[in-house]
Amino acid sequence: LCIMLGANKNKTDLLKIYHDLPQKINVEEPKINKDLRLINALIQVESNGNDSCIGDRHLIIPSVGCLQIRPIMVREVNRILAILGDNTQYKNKDRYSHEKSIEMFLIWKNFHHKDHSNEVIARSWNGGPKGPLRKRTIHYWYKVQKELSKNSKDSLGI
């Protein structure tokens, strides 16, 4: 897991991120393990574990960080936190933080996709709210599936 995440992260570090989040991200251990596998796969597809990765340079505002987060996602996460009564506010520079990127992903995922499949979550992450309906996200999902199959439970220590 440490190598795959591109930093000295292990399962304990990632579980700490989970438990340090606000109480609204209250998830059972088996669900956390599933989320961690998906997060790892998304990080590999999005940035190959590079927290400084800058993508979509052809756009006015690029996506950045290990999960290739755009400013609109930072705003969405802050909106979710406000709805949930949490005063935490993320900044665009937080996209470069491995931990904060994962936190933002989990807040978004647990608000919009709490009980959805990995496919719906991944395709929405890539293509927005209508991602699962867009043909262009199918190839992205195949790449995520490939990473998920590489990262068996044994290799993650789960």
Please give the residue ranges for each predicted region.
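Catalytic glycan-binding domains that act on GlcNAc-containing polysaccharides
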Residues: N10-I158
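Hydrophobic membrane-insertion alpha-helices, especially the h-region
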Residues: L1-G6
